[in-house]
Every structure is written in C-alpha cells, then in structure tokens.
C-alpha cells in the first residue's frame, strides 16, 4: 500500500467517523420516531375521540410522511405520564393537564396550537331543577363536575365558584365527579345530580345532535372566558417534525371541503399558535384551588 493510498483511506475513515458522530449527536438532541404516537385526554367516550381524530390523523400522516397512531387512555393522568415518559409524541390536552404536563416534564412539553375557540373558552352550568336559576341557588344541592383534572369540567368552574363565594365541599349537599362532559349531562338528566358543569363545546355538540333534551336540562350560568385546550408535543421531538405538525394545523382552511370536514369534527373555526404563558392563569387557578403546590 502506497503512502498516498493509506492517507486517502485514513481521510475516508475520518470522514465516515465524523458523519457518524454528527448523526449520533443529532439523535441525542432530537428524537425522530418512525411512528407519530398520539392521544387525548378522555373528556369524551373513547369511541368518540377516535371517530373525531381519524380524519385529522390521516391529514397529519400526509403532512409529516409518518404513520400516525391514536391510542385512547383511561384517565387524564395517563396522558400526562405518557407524554413525560416519551410514550407519546403529540397529545390533546386541556389547560390544566397542559400545566400538569409542563410540571411533570420540567418545562419541556411544548404547546404548539389551539383552536381559536380555546383562547376564549367557557363552561356551562346546567340543571333540570326549575328552582335553580343562579349560582347562589346551588347551596344545599347535589352537584357534578366532570373529571377531577378537567380544566373546563372542574378546575375553572370551581375557581369561579370560589370567587363567587361558593365552596363546593362546604356549600353543596354532595359533590360527584362524572368523569367526562357528556357523562355530566347524563348525571343531571337522570337526577343523579341536581346541577353540573361541562364545557361549552361539548354542550353545543350534544344540543346540535339532539342528544340532550333542552326542555328538561338547561343552562343557567356561564363562566367568564379562559384559555383551554391545546395540542402539545414532547420537547425532545425532532424540531422538523414539530414544525411540520404546527404548519399542518395552521394550514387547515375551512374554505376547503376536505379541511372543513376535519375542522368540524374538531369543532374548530381555525387553529392558531399558542404558548405556555397563555396557561399561567390556569396554573394560578389550580394553586388557588389547592390542586397544585
């Protein structure tokens, strides 16, 4: 072997080593999975969540070039934990579950987009009791929240009740947790609770689909607006994938029939960028309610 040949081989080896090292560094700083793993807080029945996500999942698969797999979970905490332990790449979270995910991931979870509606979200207090007309009438009544970790079915309504001088545990006869927004309506309709609270989006959907008899169950109060749902990614996901996902959501246009079908299922007029600081008020409310230290 001549000196020049040996030198060329050595240089080639150094180049390969450098490329391999560069590749390993990239992997260390950004995870690029072959499959995009997605889930959502179970604020509705699992079958309904899967039905709503299917067209969106197909759209995101086209946008990212990745296989998209949606896996329903049993409770809110499971979504937060799965995001923190890197078993999920993208998750549909409520405002409070985002705050929990931020804390659990030491600030690395990134909220990327929300529906325009989520920037001015509200909850509806409902009843089938003709004697309940105002929040003050809830004293001594049985009441149902949604899931304990639900932003719109528990945390924010509780926060506004406390601001109005009503402490659910002290002022209501009993407090129950239905587990989901649609279940809260069922509780009130069946007389399991004299009143309850759920988010406006689910209430409107149930009314439009005639799954609630508004001659029996009605809204008697509405909360002030607050930030709620968002799509959040784990912080060490490949930035290129995060950008593709963000761009895909922001590109959804209701003027395009194929996009409108997706957006209607998501109950979104459009998607807008969001940021962690939008949920500072939610974190404050959670601390005020004793749900966070």
Q: Where in this protein do the model-derived segments appear?
A:
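Twin-arginine (Tat) signal peptide motif
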Residues: 1-17, 21-25
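An extracytoplasmic/periplasmic, membrane-proximal ligand-sensing/linker region
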Residues: 33-39, 44-61, 226-228, 232-293
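Short coil/turn segments
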Residues: 43-46, 115-117, 126-132, 146-154
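Short helices/loops that flank or line small-molecule/ion binding pockets
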Residues: 77-91, 104-105, 136-139, 180-201
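Acidic, polar ligand-binding/catalytic clefts
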Residues: 81-137
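Hinge/capping helix and adjacent helix->loop/strand transition within the periplasmic-binding protein
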Residues: 126-142, 236-243, 247, 251
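Pocket-lining segment of extracytoplasmic ligand-binding domains
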Residues: 141-240
